[in-house]
Amino acid sequence: MSSLTPELRQSILEHLGFLYGERAPAVLGRLEEICSGFPAQRREGGWSEKDALLITYGDQIHAEGEPPLQTLYDFLYERLRGVFSGVHLLPFYPSTSDDGFSVVDFQRVDPELGTWTDIRIIAQDFRLMADLVCNHVSASSPWFQGFLQDDPQYQGFFITVDPGTDLSTVFRPRALPLLTPFQTPSGEKLVWTTFSPDQTDLNYANPEVLLEVIEALLCYVRNGAGLIRLDAVGFIWKEIGTSCMHLEGAHRIVKLMRLVLDAVAPHVLLVSETNAPHRENISYFGNGHDEAQLVYQFPLPPLVMHTFRTGDASKLAGWAAGLTLPSERTTFFNFLASHDGIGVVPAGGILQPEEIAALVRQALEHGGRVNHKDTPDGPVPYELCLTLFDALSNPNSDEAEDLKIARFLAANVILLSLQGIPGVYIHSLFGSPSDHAGFEESGIPRRLNRHKFTKAELEERLADPASRAAKILAAYSHLLRVRSMHPAFHPNAPQRILPSTEVLRIVRGEGDQAVGCYINVTDRPQVVSRIGKNLITGQWFTGVLKPYQAAWIID
């Protein structure tokens, strides 16, 4: 059983005092009870060059008569063992909307997907990242249904606002009303709903909410999670009259989660998901020891898209050259694609407004859709909805397929070259086209990037070695295997960004273990002043990169 050391107790009490004032000692007592009932875990933590995570839904692959989690595990084990060290399994809990992110019950597995046993089996062979959807619950959840019945236990679980309250300073991530009216026996109540009327925000000013969420966090750890993704964590603490984004209360809650995990499961890593400009994003590292160990690298996808749109890596290189980590116990979670669209807000301050507008135009020209958010100046684009393959190459153009594949792989070599742990969305393994049928059927733009496969459909694609899916899966698997063998790609290995325009030039590692990473971001051959062995091809590199070719060079 786990217990808190005097030092941990004092640190926890300090943060609880900030959040709850004189109630803090009582909350600490409850927290100690929760921790004392948790079996102490001491496993290997940290990270290495061997780490890469696949991002996928639990029902990504369907086979008739088989729970999707078992079908997924079979695919992971047969195709990707030794390629990926871990899996980010998107929310696998009962949910009513938002493809899993309107959670009904934090501590149950959706029976349509499988069971906790299926989750634990995946976690035995792959390092599991689970989502803690910490900002909100489904309007159909027992908590909110209790609130709607005026159950005293749940009256403080949600945020209600009086009519006429000035909320003009609140940051809005969506072009939807912030408040949703609900009828209760005691009358109509205006409830805070940041993301949608079906996603009711939790009230962390009530310590009971914090304790329930920490119980959910430990449930995931108990069932094998080695990483916890803190979904939309920047929104969790509200103070009227502020932006209600990235407030000190949110950071205190992350610090509390870190302290609890340090006490009971120090191998578990926190990953903050804050789709925000870089400065706010990296604030969730805290001092490098007291908040999240990993932070999502949200500027990377729009910057890579800009790089290949212009054939110029200078903006990407300039941004990457300024990246620093506060300690060796932190690193970046790098990604180019995920279940969401390509967010353009994080590129603000790096790209000019007209450059962001050009990305929006390209997405539309390539068959994508654009989601907007509300601002005082009206709706503005925040997300481009289409697959990464289609974002980089126009699916309607007569450009050669092999050139499109080369461009796509070059973009992903950038992902694998940069300092951090790479997360690879499952559709990036196949170069999937946008799912227009899924969008038309649902009306949900993000469904363009969320196609679910039947097992037979996927196997048919991969059985043809000349297919796009087979070519990209083979190439990507090779890249990840090569990467895992070289300490220069350790998430904390040194990184130098060299002057870059048509070729992105990165040096990882140092001394005789250094690797020069060169990625041609144009459709023309480029010359680089470096020769040596190309780890990707296994052949001697003589200094000329073909269009969209990448090379990892050692002396």
UniProtKB/Swiss-Prot annotation:
pH dependence of this protein's activity: Optimum pH is 6 and 6.5 in phosphorolytic and synthetic directions, respectively.
SMART domains with a match to the protein in the record: Aamy
EC number in record: 2.4.1.352
Enzyme superclass (EC): transferase
Applications reported: The excellent specific activity of this enzyme towards glycerate opens up new options for the commercial production of glucosylglycerate. This compound has been reported to be an exceptionally potent and versatile stabilizer of proteins at elevated temperatures.
Entry keyword annotation includes Glycosyltransferase: yes
Swiss-Prot/TrEMBL keywords: Carbohydrate metabolism, Glycosyltransferase, Transferase
Example of a GO biological process term: carbohydrate metabolic process
Activity as a function of temperature: Optimum temperature is 42 degrees Celsius. Retains full activity after incubating at up to 55 degrees Celsius for 10 minutes, but only 35% is left after incubating at 60 degrees Celsius.
Family that this chain belongs to: Belongs to the glycosyl hydrolase 13 family. Glucosylglycerate phosphorylase subfamily.
Summary of the function given for this chain in its UniProt record: Catalyzes the reversible phosphorolysis of glucosylglycerate into alpha-D-glucose 1-phosphate (Glc1P) and D-glycerate. May be a regulator of intracellular levels of glucosylglycerate, a compatible solute that primarily protects organisms facing salt stress and very specific nutritional constraints. Has a very strict substrate specificity. Cannot catalyze the phosphorolysis of sucrose or synthesize sucrose from Glc1P and D-fructose.
Full protein name: Glucosylglycerate phosphorylase
Organism: Allomeiothermus silvanus (strain ATCC 700542 / DSM 9946 / NBRC 106475 / NCIMB 13440 / VI-R2) (Thermus silvanus)
Lineage summary: Bacteria, Thermotogati, Deinococcota, Deinococci, Thermales
